[in-house]
Each structure stands twice: as C-alpha cells, then as structure tokens.
Amino acid sequence: MPGGAALGWILLGGLVLRLWSIKHGLPYVYNVDEEQHFVPHAVNMVGGSLNPHYFENPPALTYLLAAVFKLRFHAGFPFGSSGIERSFLRDPTAVFTSARVVVALLGTLGVGLIYWAGARFYDRRVGLVAAVLMACAFLPVFYSKQALNDAVTLVPLTVALVMCLAVYERARWWEWAIAGAAIGVAVDVKYTAGAMVVVLAIAAFGRLIEKRLTWRQLLTGGAISVAALVVAVIVLNPYALVDFSLFKHQVLNQAGTAGSSGKIGQSSQPGWIYYIWTLTWGLGWLPLIAAAAGAVLAVWADRVRGLMLVAFPILLWLFLGGQARHFGRWYMPAYPAITVLASYAAVRAADAVPLSWVPRRRTALVVAAGALLAVQGLWTSVRVDSVLAHTDTRTLTRQWIEHNVPPGSGLVVEPAVFPARFLKVGSPKHSYRLYPIKPPFQAYEKHLTPALIDTYRQQGYCYVLVASYQHDRGLNAGFKGARDYYRALAAQSQVVARFSPYRFGARPVRFNFDLSYNFLPRAYMRPGPLLELHKLNGCQ
C-alpha cells in the first residue's frame, strides 16, 4: 500500500478510536479536572473578558475552545449574546461535546505529526510505524476524549521536535524561529513542555561541535529562537504579564503542591518507578522495550540525532519522578520521542532479518513489527472505549435516588466524586438537602470519625452515599478515623442501593489515581466508582 494511503487509513483509525464514546458521562462531567480547568473558563470568555483569571494550567487551550464556542454557538462578539452561559449551566452537553471533539481532532493531528517526525528523523517506514503506535496507544487515545490539555500538547511538541532536527541539519533562520515558536506554543498548552529547549540546545551545539555552525551563527539563531518563544508565550498567555501577581501566585502554588504533598491514598512507589510502570500500559510493554533498545541504537548510529530523541523523555522523567504527586498523563509529553525511538528499533529489527526476499516481503516484516507494537494499545483502547459506552455508576445512582428517595431528604455525599449541582434537581423547595462538607475536600478522609454518624442522624441526614474513590483512599492511607467511621457506618445502617462498575464475579480493583479513573483493568464493565447508598438506622 502506498505510504499516503496507509497514513490515511491510520489517521482514520486513530480518529475512530478517539471519537468512540466521546459523549461518555454527559450531561455530567465526572473528571474533576475536565469539569473545572478549561471549558468553564472558555465559556466565560465568550461573552466576557479574555482574562482567564486562572493560571494553574496555561490558557492556550482555553482560548482555542473560546474561539470554537463563538463560531459553534454564534455567541459573543460579533454575533451578539446567545445565552451560552445560561444554556451551559442548564445542560453542558453541547459545549463539552464540542470541546472533546476539538481535542480528538488535535489528537488525530498529533498522529499525523508523529509520522512526520519519524520520517524526518529516519524514513517513512519509521514514520508509519510510529503513527500506528500513537494512533492506538491507550493513554493518548483515552485523553483525546477529555477536554484537557494532555493530548493537545503533543501537537506543538512534535512540531518543535522536528524543527529542532531542522536546526541541526540546516539551521536556517526561519527554522530557528519556528522551533522557538513551537516550544512557546507547547509551553502555553502545558508548562512542563518548556524542557524542550534542551533539545534545541542539543541540536545547536551538536552542529557547532561538528563545525557546521560558528559561535556567531549560534548566538544569532539562538536569539531568534528565544525571541520567537517569548512572543509565542506572550501572545497566547498575555494576562500572565497583565495580571502577573496572580499568575505567579497560582503557578508557584501549583508547583509547590505537586512537588511537596502527595495525594491521600496515592501509591507509595517512587515516582521514577511509577512513570516507567505507566508506560507499560499507557504505551505498551513491547513499545517500552523497543524504545529502550531504540534509544541505544539511535545514539550509537548518530549521537546528536539520538540525543535529541532521548533527552526530553529522560529530563521529564527525572523531574516528574521527583515530584510528590504522580499521574500517568503528566508524562504524555514524552510520548512523541518515545514512539519514534520504539518505531526505529522495530524497523531496524525488521531490516536485520537476513532475507534475500523481494522488497515486498521486507515490507511485510515492517508491517508485522508495527502491528506487534500497536496490538496492546489497540486492544486496551477498544476495550475501554466499550466500557465508556456503558452508563456510569454515578448516573445510575442519581437515577435511583430520584426515583426512590423523597425530595427534601438529607443526603451525605462524599466530595470530589460528583460534579457540582449533581444532586440539586428540581426547584430549591424540592431538591435534596446536602450535608455541608467543609473544604479542603482533599483532606476529607483525614477528618472522618464515627461521631459524625450521630451528627448526621441528629440533623436529619438519613442517607449516606459512600464512593470507593474516597473510601479506598482513606483505607489506603491508613487513617484510623476513616477505618472506624466506615465500620460504624456499616453497623448502623442498611445498604439500600449498590452500583458496581465491575463485571459479575470480578474482584474490585485496588484504588489507584490512574487505573481507578481510566478503567483500564479488565474487571471494569462500566465507568465510575463502586457506590453504596446507606440509610441510617433510627433516622427520621
């Protein structure tokens, strides 16, 4: 099959995987980060100020979504007001679906750019294998279904990677400029992408060492790249300067939180081991092994070119591994380089087979190598896509409560499990009374004691909804108060409804901040936590 046609089929397949179950959970958004970080700020921008007033994550995706919402819903200038804010509060389905489709399309664009990167660093065969791997890899597919910046970051990062190679090969002024601008755009999508400047430095100094660049040319080109980077950062994040005190406060606060305090119930593994483990399922076992081999082969064959691919994944791994909090998606910016390295190793392995066959047989070996690299990702992506197609346990729980618990009843709902306003149905007079849980919600499990149950009963909060997301975190952390609370609750109540995400007969999945939210383990039949609704004994 010609390369262009093959790439077209790969892109189509990658898009299908990313659009499958794209409306999962809606009209409710169960991923807390997706619910809070980008889409609500973009909606506010449509008819208001372009200042996001939020810098914990950079705003490039927010601005893009705001522009899409303007065009999609004919809202804000120059269309006039269309009440997008009110309709978003009533039913956010259309807005979140639009945002997710944008991310899915950008994720698919990333697949095409991975082909470009593989072809530019080596040849078209490496590019096609890399594209297949990225099209199917579980973590890029999964986060292309969320209105988050993780999959989006791969687009400017891959462009930056290729343009750094162009600087190493030719070092024309516009290549310096595009490399710097691409890094700047990547930083405005995800701050950790800034480490890509090291790859640009490797390209520049590699050319200098090979005496294909003078110091004057290096300084001139470097100045062009830095200027382009700064311009890109300012254009896509102008209020970082206008509202610098807020920008500085939020970024430093976020960095301090991620670097100094782990999440309650988090794995005790060192971060460096944790991120290697995430590659075994986020990308796949064979791709991980192939990437390690590819790193050695690439550096051996061409030191500078190989280091350009190896440097960013290693730097990001060292930095993230030293943080207190660990999430598999945080390491996704390293996936483009890792994918190219794995594909390079696969093609080298196919070429090493001593065959005197016609070239078509050799091509078949490359196809087989690519299929082997991609099969784990394809299998897990298809399986999780089918899981997401089922109704979430939280939606089932809400439906049961609406039909079986009288309006006005008092409910205790554990925090950070349901979206805002999830159980506030009907008019205020007929909605449920929710027990006021004081923030910070991340410390909820620390403050649990059996005495709370008497408080619930005295104040008429007769129903207590327990979610495995909170329950398991408290027990994993070893909090005695949480353990005693859940034991007392079980002894002083009856479970009136139970909604499980697991297949019949499957063992519950041990809580993990990745696997419990991406539903990768085979035990899952539907998305969501295990939920139990307790009715307190002797409560009126």
Task: Pin down the residues of each PLM region.
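Membrane-interface transmembrane helices that cradle and orient dolichyl/undecaprenyl
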Residues: M1, A119-F121, R125, A160-W176, ...
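Start-transfer (signal-anchor) and selected internal transmembrane alpha helices
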Residues: M1-W20, L109-G112, A119-F121, L128-V129, ...
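Signature aromatic-anchored transmembrane alpha helix within multi-pass, membrane-resident enzymes
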Residues: G8, V198, A223-A227, V231, ...
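Short helix- or helix-capping micro-motifs
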Residues: L11-L17, A130-A135, V162, I183, ...
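Transmembrane-lumen/periplasm boundary regions of multi-pass, lipid-linked membrane glycan transferases
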Residues: L17-W20, H41, Y63-L64, V185, ...
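Catalytic lumenal/periplasmic loop and adjoining terminal transmembrane helix
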Residues: L19, K23, P27, Y239-L241, ...
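Transmembrane-helix motifs of polytopic, lipid-linked glycan transferases
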Residues: L89-T93, T97, V101-Y122, V159, ...
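Hydrophobic/aromatic-rich transmembrane helices and adjacent perimembrane loops
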Residues: Y143-S144, D150-T153, A186, Y191, ...
